[in-house]
Structures are given as structure tokens and as C-alpha cells.
Amino acid sequence: MKYDSIFSSAMRSVRAQEHLYNEIALKNTEKIISAFRKHQVSDYYMKPTTGYAYADMGRDKLDDIYADIFHTEAALVRSQFVSGTHALAVAMLGNLRPGDEVIGATGTPYDTMQTIIGYPVKTPGSLVDLGIVYKEIPMTERYIDSKAVCQAITPATKMVHIQRSCGYSALRDTLDVASIGDLIQAVHTIRPDIICFVDNCYGEFTELLEPTDVGADLMAGSLIKNPGGGLAPTGGYIVGKEACVYNAACRLTAPGLAGEMGATLGDTAREFYQGLFMAPHVVMQAVKTAIYAAAVFSKLGYEVKPAPDQIRHDIIQAITLNSSKNLENFCVAIQVNSPVDAYVVPEPANIPGYQDKIIMAAGTFVQGASIELSADGPMREPYNVFMQGGLTFEHGQLAINAAARMIGPASKSKKLKGDVVIKNEKDPEIIASVEKIVKKYNLETEDI
């Protein structure tokens, strides 16, 4: 197998599209710099606060900047959000009451959203548990069925939930902003008061527009994904209409307290500001990494989504690896080529919020940061790996090259007892990683 030829071909795929994504990064950086300049960001805003933090000007100023960037009435950017899932839950639970109805417009959401909703898995404190009605509209041919969504609207409908990213699904595409706008327009034509809520995780700054530019009333995401630029150590954000954001803030803190409290500890404020400034550039490093991965693994005969030449609307690259051991081997290769915990061997485990065991490769500086190069997937057929992130494209290249050499072509792989797939490669790091797996599962092989 001439891997160097495959890698060179993949680089050509990246270069063919680079100008488009560089232009997007340029325009989004201009938007952020303009907001920083308008709000006269200074070193003073990056100081830590303690206790109630009533007068945290840096926190409040960052809210204003996010509202400007996303063109919304208000924003809530806080380190007190423990994850993107938390921000999504706060946004929904803050704006819904018993008897209200939510329509899931993008089919089955990813696993952690299912626990927030309480369907199909019953969870204490979920929407369904609190008496909120949930209706789910399947997507058709990977696209939103706007007609079915609109037909499902009743007088009780309070919110339409839109998941931008594909999540752990190979049956749908990530939505572009224009498609989200079309759905929102259709919903608001029927009922302008319905809250169109977008889960924007993984999608920020991949396009020139955001869902709030095309009518979204409420939107949420994670700071250890795109908008944190690889520097934010924790946190999440909610942006949208003032009343919706206020309701969410009351859910995060307490009724009446809303966004007026919440200390910014340590160096977090600077990391939030600097991370946001870096975000458009870092997001495009991740996009280029995803294009490269798609090109390499499609050349090796694996199904990839999106395709190498497909326009990107988030930073996720899905690769169908066809077996559980291929999935494990891929994650091992990514982990071995990480800057942190490179000596660790990933293995499947039960993780809160997920219905199947999950395997993750995440040798990241910030735990769980998916804007840093990481890969994960549920241990279920067809064994898709979802790779995302990459603070630098160069790091992404190195890790993907190693994963390709470790797994080999889809049609010419050699199978071992236990269905571990290994190529006859002589790279010492790859051999050492494979030996760990073989030893762990008591396998036998003559091909190491």
C-alpha cells in the first residue's frame, strides 16, 4: 500500500478547498474584532472575581460581545455551565413549563439530548418527567421534513428543537444555516411565538452566518468546542431573545438572580476572551483536518461523511469502520499521537448520558474538549467513528496518517481472532499500541 501517495492526494483535496474556508475565517475574525473594538475590551475585563461577583464587568461585557457576534438581544456566557449538554438543558428547562409541547424537528437527537428530553430513556428531572410533551419528526432523505414539522404544531407547541450537527447518526447530514432558516421561517409563518431553539454545538464559525442570523429565537453551545478556540477550560453559552435568555439564566442560578451573579475564577476570563478571538482560525484548522481525514479514508475504501469535497457545516467527520476492533484501533492511533496521555490505551466504557458503551480518544489539554483533536464512537453497528477538532492542521495530519497505517484498506485488511484489524506495518509506535490491544484481549496474531 502506497500510503505516501494517498496522503499527497488528500493534501490536494485540502488545498482545493482551502481558499473558501480561509475566507470564512477572515470574515468571522473581522466580526469578532469589530465586537471587541465596539465594547472597548481592556485588560481590566480579564481580572478574576470572587463570591457573588455582582460587579463582574468582564463577565457582563463578554455577554454583550457574544450578543453582538451572534446578532441577538442577549447572551449568557458562563463558566458555571459544566458542558454543552448543561447549556442545552438550561435553555430548554428555563423556557418550558408542564403542559408545553416540544417538537424535535431533526429526528432522534444524540444520546445526551435523549436524557434531557426523557425519551426514549426515562430520566429524573427530564422534560417528559416534568410533564412536558415531546414529539419527534423523522428527517427524510437526511433533510428536515418541514411540512411534517408544521403539521405537528398544535396550540400547546412552545418550542421547536433543531439539532444542527449529525451527532452519532450516519442517517442524516449536518444542517447548513440556510436549511435551518427555511424551517424557522415555515414555523414562524404559522406561529411567530414558537421558540425555535438551535443546538449549535460543533457548528460555530464554520459558515459566514449563524442560525440566529436566520431567525433562531434561542441557541446554545459549549465553550470547549468551537467558540472557546481551544483555550476555554470549561463553560457554555446561550444567546437569543432577551426574555428567553433571562428565563435560562434564572434556571442556571435562581429565580430573580438570573445573570447578575456568578464569579469568574482564576484566568478564566482571559481564556474566554482570547479563545473567542482565536476561534475562527482554530475552527478552520479543525475543518481542514476533517477534510484530510475524509480524503484519506475514502481512498482506503471506507464510507465517510461528509465526503472530502462536500461543503462543511460543522467540524465532525464520520468514518464507517465496519467492526468494533477497527473502531478501537482508530482511537488508539489518535490517542498515541496526542500531546497529552499518549501512553494511554482507550477502551470502551459506560459514560453518563449514553445508551451504549463509548470509546474515546482524547489526548487533550482540556478534558473532553472536542475542538482539540479527538475521536469517539458508540460500540454499536456499523461502528462509526466521529472525529473532530484539531488545534493545528499539522497535528491532525500526523494522527490521521498513523490511523490509516494502523487500520489499512477496507478491502484488504487482515482479520485476527477477535476481529481486531491490523496492517503489516513496521512503525514501532503502531506496533506497541497494537500489542497492548492484543495482550488486553488475549488475542493471537502473526502479523505484528
Regions found by a protein language model. Name each.
Residues 2-16, 22, 32-38, 42-45, ...:
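Conserved PLP-enzyme active-site core in the AAT-like
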Residues 46-76:
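Active-site-flanking structural segment that lines cofactor/substrate pockets
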Residues 49-50, 76-79, 315-320:
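Short glycine-rich or small-residue beta-strand-to-loop segments that form or flank ligand, phosphate
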Residues 67-91:
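Short loop-beta-helix segment that forms the pyridoxal 5′-phosphate
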Residues 73-76, 100-103, 158-159, 193-196, ...:
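Structural motif
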Residues 298-430:
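Conserved C-terminal alpha-helix-loop-beta "cap" of PLP-dependent enzymes
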